[in-house]
Amino acid sequence: FHLLRSFLPGMKAKREGWIFPVLSMAAREAFPGWSGYCASKWALDGMITALRAELAGSGLRITSLFPGATDTAIWDDLPGSWNRGAMVPAREIARAVGFALDGDPASLVEEIKIGPAGGAL
């Protein structure tokens, strides 16, 4: 939110730029025990979806990223036992973002939802 407030005016003035908010599968799915986290992600998704509509035709682009459990160091400090081998490799997230960036300027990948092949962990 604060980054958008800081950078959006300049991006609008230049009529160019790409915003890649990293949300979470928790913005679209309810996870028991994570209600506060889910609520914050649902709210952010709503704000970004509205902003995408507001910016249509402005030259600015927004591609929302909804990663599921991704194998990164963040899991090192979380309590519990996590099957890191079943998580999405971080390089796959990068490949998905690259796909969106390399697309034809006449099209827009609005959302990327990528999660573990076996479902939510």
What are these regions (language model features)?
Residues 31-35, 86:
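Active-site loop immediately N-terminal to the catalytic Tyr-X3-Lys motif
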Residues 57-60, 64-65, 80-121:
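C-terminal helical subdomain
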Residues 24:
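Residue(s) in the substrate-gating loop at a strand-loop-helix junction
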Residues 4, 40:
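Active-site helix of classical SDR
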Residues 11-12, 74, 87:
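Methionine-biased hydrophobic packing positions in alpha-helices, especially
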Residues 67-77:
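Short, flexible catalytic-loop segment of classical short-chain dehydrogenase/reductase
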